């Protein structure tokens, strides 16, 4: 047995032997490809049936973290973390550029968010009594609450030794997002650092997508009053359904980002009352939609920050319309085949109907022709019978002197151009019968009527001869017979 299969598998617990090395290599490859999942969790319920179903396979892949190791363009900047860690992951804000903090009382100012001429609807949203940006004119530190338009990022707590920013997660519907800027009473200039600030975006469908927010500040000499923890949510209707990113280092548009933008484009934001906060002296938050330029968040007396709008926003309607065109063009194959078969059946039905009408017309025409043919055959048969009867009648009266006299007088006068033999010498009765037969058959119906007239006249003459016996003997005697009698 060992001589027939000399190649032994060296895997632990497997003692199979194979005839050649190729089979052994394939067998070893199966050992290498065997999936080895980690131990089951202690809190999971033990199920007796351990059949590897697709659901269990996906669950095991999630447990071992197979789906979290997908390649992304930001894998050098971020590390692998779970969803709970993403929501609570602290990031250091020390390299970020923040406004200069000074212990100075400032007057209330207006926070205005503009972004130029967008093809999307132009919602204007203002805050109400509870959603104001209030600045206190006291020596106590105050805080400024600013929410950029449609900034949709996960709940990330960003802390540093001097300031902290809390950005709440925004869902596709317009919700409140609060940015709390807290600063101590010390004055400290912060130098802006070039480059985008990375964040992890948690999409509503459960995926995680990294984004970059620019950290440049246009005005470094702005003043922010000393802050006291004052948190009031500012609700603004998003005018740009995208995530602002840097103008030059724009990341590659991934499929998840395009899906997110399409979902946000379909979302129709509700416009809140825009006249409630115009009379308040503390501040006014407005959102204007104009031409797609870099979106700037302007706070004249507090801070100034520019966040360029996403360049892919003005063309968001094009992929949707193209998708609708593709869906219209690419119909269901079953529906297309059903319509094709229906058209074929209708065409075949029309063809069968036309053929049926044509065949019926041919049958009717054939019946008419057959009936006409039968009538003609009957007429021909009757005519033949009549001709035969007339022939018999002529043969019966071939020796009649009246017939001979009528022939001499009638046929002689009618046929003057005939030979002299016919005029001088009377023809034989057989020849006369043949001539009568040929005339009657050639002339058809007219010859038949003529023969009837001749027969009628002959019968009349015979009747006259029977009533006057002396006359026919004298008048009917041929000259050949009269000469010998005279001699």
UniProtKB/Swiss-Prot annotation:
* Keyword Magnesium listed: no
| Cross-referenced SMART domains | BRLZ
Does the record bear Nucleus in its keywords?
A: yes
Report domain bZIP positions: 334-397
Q: Give the region (Basic motif) as residue ranges.
A: 336-356
Query: Which residue stretches does the UniProt record annotate as biased composition, category Low complexity?
Result: 298-319, 437-449
Highest taxon of the source?
Answer: Eukaryota
Composition bias (Basic and acidic residues) maps to 328-345
Tell me one Pfam family matched here.
bZIP_1
Major site of localization recorded for this protein = nucleus
Q: Which SUPFAM superfamilies does the UniProt entry name for this protein?
A: beta-beta-alpha zinc fingers, Leucine zipper domain
Q: Where is the composition biased (Polar residues)?
A: 425-436, 457-468
- Where do the coiled-coil regions begin and end? none
Positions of the UniProt region annotated as Leucine-zipper: 362-390
Entry's Gene Ontology cellular component terms: mitochondrial outer membrane; nucleus
Q: Which UniProt keywords apply?
A: Activator, Cytoplasm, DNA damage, DNA-binding, Membrane, Metal-binding, Mitochondrion, Mitochondrion outer membrane, Nucleus, Transcription, Transcription regulation, Zinc, Zinc-finger
Instruction: List where in the cell it is found.
Output: Nucleus; Cytoplasm; Mitochondrion outer membrane
Q: Where is this region: Disordered?
A: 106-132, 267-354, 407-487
Task: Enumerate the InterPro entries for this protein.
Answer: bZIP, bZIP_sf, bZIP_transcription_factors, TF_CRE-BP1-typ, Znf_C2H2_sf, Znf_C2H2_type
Zinc finger region(s), C2H2-type: 7-31
An example GO biological process term is:
DNA damage response
Q: Which GO terms describe its molecular function?
A: cAMP response element binding; DNA-binding transcription factor activity, RNA polymerase II-specific; zinc ion binding
Q: Which CDD domains match?
A: bZIP_ATF2, GCN4_cent
Q: How does it assemble?
A: Binds DNA as a dimer and can form a homodimer in the absence of DNA. Can form a heterodimer with JUN. Heterodimerization is essential for its transcriptional activity.
Report the sequence similarity comment from the record: Belongs to the bZIP family. ATF subfamily.
Give the protein's recorded name. Cyclic AMP-dependent transcription factor ATF-2
- The species this protein was found in: Gallus gallus (Chicken)
Name of the gene: ATF2
């Amino acid at each position: 047995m060992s001589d027939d299969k000399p190649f032994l598998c060296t895997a632990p617990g497997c003692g199979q032997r194979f005839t050649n090395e190729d089979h052994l290599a394939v067998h070893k490859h199966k050992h290498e490809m065997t999936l080895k999942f980690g131990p089951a969790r202690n809190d999971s319920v033990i199920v007796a049936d351990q059949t590897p179903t697709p659901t269990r396979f996906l669950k095991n892949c999630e447990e071992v973290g197979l789906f979290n190791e997908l390649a992304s363009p930001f894998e050098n900047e971020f590390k692998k973390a779970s969803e709970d860690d993403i929501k609570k992951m602290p990031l250091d804000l020390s390299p970020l550029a923040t406004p200069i903090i000074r212990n100075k009382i400032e007057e209330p100012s207006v926070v205005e968010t503009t972004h130029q001429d967008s093809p999307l609807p132009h919602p204007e949203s203002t805050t109400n009594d509870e959603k104001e940006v209030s600045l206190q004119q006291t020596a106590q530190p105050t805080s400024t609450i600013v929410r950029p338009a449609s900034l949709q990022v996960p709940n990330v707590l960003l802390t540093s030794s001097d300031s902290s920013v809390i950005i709440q997660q925004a869902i596709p519907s317009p919700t409140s997002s609060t940015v709390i800027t807290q600063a101590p009473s010390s004055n400290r200039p912060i130098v802006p650092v070039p480059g985008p600030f990375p964040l992890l975006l948690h999409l509503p469908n459960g995926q995680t997508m990294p984004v970059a927010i620019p950290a440049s500040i246009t005005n470094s000499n702005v003043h922010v009053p000393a802050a006291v923890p004052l948190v009031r949510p500012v609700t603004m209707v998003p005018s740009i359904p995208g995530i602002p990113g840097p103008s030059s280092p724009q990341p590659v548009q991934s499929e998840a980002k395009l899906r997110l933008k399409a979902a946000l484009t379909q979302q129709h934001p509700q416009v809140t009352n825009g006249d409630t906060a115009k009379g308040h002296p503390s501040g006014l938050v407005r959102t204007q939609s104009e031409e797609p330029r870099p979106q700037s968040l302007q706070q004249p007396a507090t801070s100034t920050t520019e966040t360029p709008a996403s360049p892919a926003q003005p063309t968001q309607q094009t992929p949707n319309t193209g998708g609708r065109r593709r869906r219209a063009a690419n119909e269901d194959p079953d529906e297309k085949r059903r319509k094709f078969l229906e058209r074929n059946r209708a065409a075949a039905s029309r063809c069968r109907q036309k053929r049926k009408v044509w065949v019926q017309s041919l049958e009717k025409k054939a019946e008419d022709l057959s009936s006409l043919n039968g009538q003609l055959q009957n007429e021909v048969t009757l005519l033949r019978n009549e001709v035969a009867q007339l022939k018999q009648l002529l043969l019966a009266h071939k020796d009649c002197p009246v017939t001979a006299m009528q022939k001499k007088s009638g046929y002689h006068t009618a046929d003057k151009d005939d030979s002299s033999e016919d005029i001088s010498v009377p023809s034989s009765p057989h020849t006369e019968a043949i001539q009568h037969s040929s005339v009657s058959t050639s002339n058809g119906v007219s010859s038949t009527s003529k023969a009837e007239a001749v027969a009628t006249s002959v019968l009349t003459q015979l009747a006259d001869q029977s009533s006057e016996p002396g006359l026919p003997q004298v008048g009917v005697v041929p000259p050949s017979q009269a000469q010998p009698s005279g001699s």
